[in-house]
Design a protein with these regions (language model features):
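Ser/Thr-rich, Pro/Gly/Ala-heavy low-complexity intrinsically disordered linkers and tails
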Residues: 19-132
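Catalytic core of carbohydrate-active enzymes
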Residues: 547-554, 559, 566-578, 591-592, ...
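Aromatic- and carboxylate-enriched substrate-binding clefts and catalytic-loop regions
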Residues: 249, 385-657, 692-694
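Conserved, mostly hydrophobic/aromatic
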Residues: 161, 212, 289, 379, ...
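Catalytic and substrate-binding clefts that recognize carbohydrates or anionic sugar/phosphate headgroups
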Residues: 199-354, 363-365, 369, 376-381, ...
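Short, well-ordered beta-strand segments enriched in hydrophobic/aromatic residues
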Residues: 161, 171, 206-215, 712-716, ...
Length: 880
């Protein structure tokens, strides 16, 4: 009998290499094992962290894999695979390693890494035990077993259950006699190192067991069900399609909450009892990923348009085109772990340059070099923090779309403009569209106007690089590798390399047929009919930009792409998304909050909105409330057709806006550390409450509150004229940010929220590093104010690097872990791990133990409890 008391008929253990027989049991252990077993260590750039050992067991504890050697940092890849390495268990860093209680590293291919500590804090759960099997290899006419999984014959069709990792399962099925060959556009992990697993057969049911999961397949029907290792049901397929359509259906209990599917304007984030047509359009980004409050996720890997449907008993997904069902199952049990599994599958999100976590000032559109200079001076002379000014479209007029010519009559010297911006510590981003215009008679003096169009139009293999159009505008085929290479080179030659732009605004990437009507779905692409891949158009466009930049890019600059549309996996191409062209009204604003939260629950880390709306002019009150919300999105950006620069509002309005802008910049050490956590662990910064309060049924329907990182509960005001709002406080003790007053969780309170302030609460046990008042993200943040919110244990890892290079990929960064022991009233500051060029040798930490008398609000604290002079060696501070 195994450890769960069920008789085994037969079983098999499969290891990374070959087959091995061993004693039969499955033990998930305590889940606190930091690294994976020996044989799976990973270090250096591009490493895949936490590979399982070749002996077939996944070990808990502090094995050799996953932690790093003294003096260096392990890092994730930027193009796929998992976050590498990770810290030792229990919250204290290994020498040279990343610290962080419960900050578990992302899953490695075929193994799982965990830093230990509390669950729900990111990364995949540790294996925490071994899987061992006894008996003979199960045999039968309906299935075959290999080291990657089990292939079934079901009727006249085929199905494969692939064990990608201990908590990641892929299911492929078709009504054809063999599974089609497929190269996924979304999935970047090759699953070269599958984990150990057992295969058992009894009473017509074949069970695959890993250290984390049991996958049960009814051999006669191919129905798949999932349980944890204790046989607690997670989800099960409810039927197989008899029609040959690409459809999967799953059971769903009435109390289940479902989240994800990308971002669409809505008043609710819970997808239960709803139907959604999954086809990208302006304002609607669809990611075929759902997450359940029960602790699992499902990702359908099919880029055609599709349909999702949820009822009281069933969840289904139907693809509009394709020749097989292909989906991934992710097990948590926490939602952070589910999302980390998705990122392990589709690729980690690289770090943006630090500047990209500051404020973007954008408008449709700045019409000249002098206008951009005026905006720059307005911010810098007004002492208003900002990091980027954006050049929207039409800078090419009267030249052709796609020419990338900046009209010399309006932009006399773009290079000098960018030099001036950089001197003022402001970055520039420029709009690029994936379309090219044919002009039979270009404007006089437009030398080279048609060069880009002509070069693409001449490409005809394997298909035309430009889609056929009955008019003058043509989208390029992003599925054509040669076209992607050429498109980036044109952008680099005429804009990035020539003038020094720092980021790319990839507009109209659905693509929406504008200004001429072009149906991309009906076109022939390099990968077949457009209808089979249409939703992945923006993914492949971002791939062109990212891969081109990494090969031939501006020296020393990390890639930054802002795109209007997206598809699963786009995060690995250093892309953020925004919610499209929206109206400047209250109803639209209200819907932005659940839209952004849904996007994060779809596995997508970076999202923003046109603060103040795109169409129309917002009132000062609406813009202020929208701006307050925007400061706590994962990207902070003003855009629209109206004039909305912060210095253009009334004296009172400007003061209110400056207050939240200043707070955002004071939080930059916190924000940038969370950005690293996003890259390194698959974390999500802008967090629906279900991330952290998964068992609290009250949070499932809350769509206007969210966590910003682990500490801050953000409660935007969404009612005109309101000076307070109702706030639900989840379990625990909470501090009102502005006053330091405490409240007990599990209750609803009325929070003060005049127009000058957004309602914010801080969870007890939080540690928030705050910098001085700064004007741009890379300005010096010494001294650091370390705010400690007593009442519970807690920790926070401060991450720092050069700010805008890829040296972090080779371990050039530092981490310092702060740990609060509430019972002992002691803040421990760990050794600094790692180093980077320009790292200060010493730091000043102004420690503040927050209460109602000090350490409150956005201003720099004048009452300091303890000044710590830090030289990189562990030290501490004690509360009185």
């Amino acid at each position: 009998m195994n450890s769960h008391g069920r008789l085994k008929k037969s079983s098999l253990i499969l290891a990374v290499v070959g087959f091995a027989l061993a004693g039969c049991s499955s033990s998930s252990g305590g889940g606190s094992g930091g690294s994976t077993g020996s044989g799976g260590a990973s270090s250096g750039a591009g490493g895949v962290g936490g590979k399982s050992g070749t002996g077939g067991s996944l070990q808990g504890g502090s094995g050799a894999g996953g932690s790093k050697a003294s003096g260096g940092n392990t890092t994730p890849t930027t193009t796929g695979g998992a976050a590498a390495g990770g810290a030792q268990a229990g919250g204290s860093p290994a020498a040279g390693g990343n610290a962080g209680k419960g900050s578990g590293g992302s899953a490695g291919a075929g193994g799982v890494a965990q830093n230990g500590g509390a669950p729900g804090s990111g990364g995949q759960t540790g294996a925490g035990g071994t899987v061992t099997c006894t008996g003979t290899t199960p045999t039968g006419t309906s299935f075959t077993v290999d080291k990657s999984g089990v292939t079934f014959t079901v009727g006249t069709g085929k199905m494969k259950v692939q064990v990608c990792a201990a908590d990641i399962i892929r299911v492929m099925s078709t009504s054809a006699a063999s599974l089609p060959t497929k190269t996924s556009l979304s999935v970047s992990n090759a699953w070269d190192n599958p984990p150990a697993f057992c295969v058992d057969e009894a009473a017509g049911i074949l069970t695959i067991t890993t250290t984390r999961l049991k996958v049960k397949v009814t051999e006669s029907t191919g129905i798949v069900s999932y349980t944890d290792t204790a046989d607690t049901a997670l989800v099960a397929e409810s039927s197989k399609s008899a029609s040959g359509k690409v459809v999967t259906a799953f059971t769903s209990t009435s109390d289940e909450a479902l989240f994800g599917l990308g971002q669409q304007p809505s008043n609710n984030s819970n997808r239960k009892n709803s139907s959604v047509h999954l086809a990208n359009s302006n304002g609607n980004i669809f990611i075929p990923m759902i997450v359940s409050n029960k602790g699992y996720g499902l990702f359908w890997d099919n880029p055609s348009a599709g349909d999702f449907s949820s009822t009281g008993t069933t969840t289904s997904y139907t693809s509009g085109a394709g020749d097989m069902v292909d989906y991934y199952f992710f097990y948590g049990p926490t939602i952070d772990q589910v999302i980390a599994g998705y990122r392990t599958t589709t690729g980690p999100a690289p770090l943006f340059g630090k500047w990209a976590y500051g404020l973007f000032q954008s408008k449709d559109h700045y019409g000249s070099q002098s206008e951009i200079t005026t905006v720059m001076n307005g911010y810098r002379n007004g002492k208003i923090p900002v990091d980027c000014i954006v050049q929207d479209w039409d800078y090419w007029d009267p030249y052709s779309w796609g020419s990338h010519i900046m009209d010399p009559s309006r932009y006399a010297d773009p290079k000098a403009l960018l030099t001036s911006m950089h001197t003022n510590n402001i970055h520039g981003m420029i709009s690029i569209w994936p379309e090219y215009q044919y002009m039979a008679n270009p404007p006089t003096g437009a030398a080279g106007d048609q060069d880009n169009y002509n070069a693409l139009n001449a490409m005809t293999s394997p298909t035309k690089a430009l889609y056929t159009s009955g008019a003058s505008h043509h989208f390029y085929d992003t599925f054509n590798a040669a076209a992607r290479t050429l498109v980036y080179q044109q952008i680099y030659d005429k804009l990035l390399g020539k003038y020094g732009w720092d980021g790319i605004w990839a507009d109209n990437t659905e693509p929406q047929a504008y200004p001429d009507s072009v149906d991309v779905g009906s076109q022939d692409t390099a990968l077949g009919k457009g209808s089979t891949v249409i939703n992945a158009y923006p993914l492949q466009h971002s791939k062109a930009l990212y891969e081109g930049w990494r090969k031939v890019g501006p020296d020393g600059k990390r890639v930054y792409i802002l795109t209007r549309s997206a598809w699963a996996g786009i995060q690995r191409y250093s892309a953020a998304e925004w919610s499209g062209d929206i109206q400047a009204d209250l109803g639209t604003f209200v819907k932005q909050i659940p839209a952004g939260l849904s996007y994060g629950l779809s596995g997508m880390p970076y999202w923003t909105t046109d603060i103040g709306g795109y169409f129309g002019t917002p009132s000062e009150e609406l813009f202020t409330r929208w701006f307050q919300f925007g400061a706590f999105c994962s990207q902070f950006r003003i855009h629209g057709q109206a004039t909305k620069e912060l210095y253009t509002w009334s004296t009172t309005g400007k003061a209110n806006l400056l207050a939240v802008d200043t707070l955002h910049y004071r939080l930059m050490p916190y924000i940038y550390s969370l950005a690293w956590k996003t890259t390194n662990e698959g974390y999500t910064i802008m967090r629906h409450l279900v991330f952290d309060y998964q068992k609290d049924t009250k949070v499932y329907g809350i769509a206007d509150q969210f966590m910003y990182g682990p500490a801050l509960l953000v409660n935007p005001v969404i009612t005109t004229g309101a000076t307070s709002r109702s706030v639900y406080l989840p379990a625990g003790t909470w501090y009102e940010f502005w006053t330091g007053a405490t409240a007990t969780g599990g209750t609803t309170v009325t929070a003060d929220a005049p127009l000058s302030k957004i309602s914010l609460y801080v969870k007890a046990g939080s540690i928030i590093p705050m910098g001085p008042n700064i004007q741009y993200a890379t300005e010096s943040i010494d001294p650091l104010e370390i705010r400690v919110y007593k009442g519970a244990n807690g920790s926070f890892t401060l991450y720092e690097d050069e700010g805008d290079s890829y040296n972090y990929e080779t371990g050039k960064y530092s981490t310092i872990t702060f740990t609060w022991d509430d019972a002992g009233k002691k803040l421990s500051i760990g050794d600094r791990n790692g180093s980077y060029t320009g790292m200060p040798a010493s730091r000043t930490f102004n420690v503040v133990f927050v209460d109602s008398t000090h350490g409150t609000g956005a201003d720099v604290s004048t009452t300091i409890d303890q000044v710590v002079k830090y030289d990189g060696t562990a030290t501490s501070a004690t509360a009185k």
